[in-house]
Amino acid sequence: MRLFLMFNMLFNWFPQAEPLIVTVNQEQIEWQSVCGTSSTKTYMDYRMITNRDSQQYKYIQSRMEARNGLLYDTDGSIGVALGSWWGKIGSKWTVELSSGEVYDLVKIDEKADKHTINGCQHIGDGSVIEFVIDTQTVPNSWWGGNGLVWNGNFNNYHKFKGNIQRIGKKKTVEVELDVSEFFPNHIQYK
């Protein structure tokens, strides 16, 4: 027996408890200065994006789903048009309104720089956020007396009412976690 133990110790064949490390993706929010605080929130139908070669069109077709008039990404973010200040198509943001409502948004269309102030706020109507919607699935109660959804401004709907209070850029980072304590019988062989 003594020879067997010495042989195993020499060649390190005994099972050894090692940390069990897993890598997971974790979403983080980097809070930033607000480029515009407008309460105006306009909309456009996603069918207005017709260039099949554009990033916008491809993103919408591959990742967005229409539910009750809004377009949702696979993670639940609401599809919107934003200016160039907000980054590329697919950029994800968390927006908090002065009402306390918080929304996760994804940029699926871009407002032209010539129509915005510093790539942020629309020159004509002052909107920062423009919802990209599916007018064919909009609930009847959303149609205003003027024939527009929420009379042309999502701020007229209590859930989207308020000025932009703060914004956060969403990003995904890889994090390593030691999960050994959850698997006490885990043994790795060297």
What are these regions (language model features)?
Residues 1-16:
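Sec-dependent N-terminal signal peptides of Gram-positive bacterial secreted proteins and lipoproteins
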Residues 13-190:
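Solvent-exposed, well-ordered loop and adjacent helix/strand elements within mature globular domains
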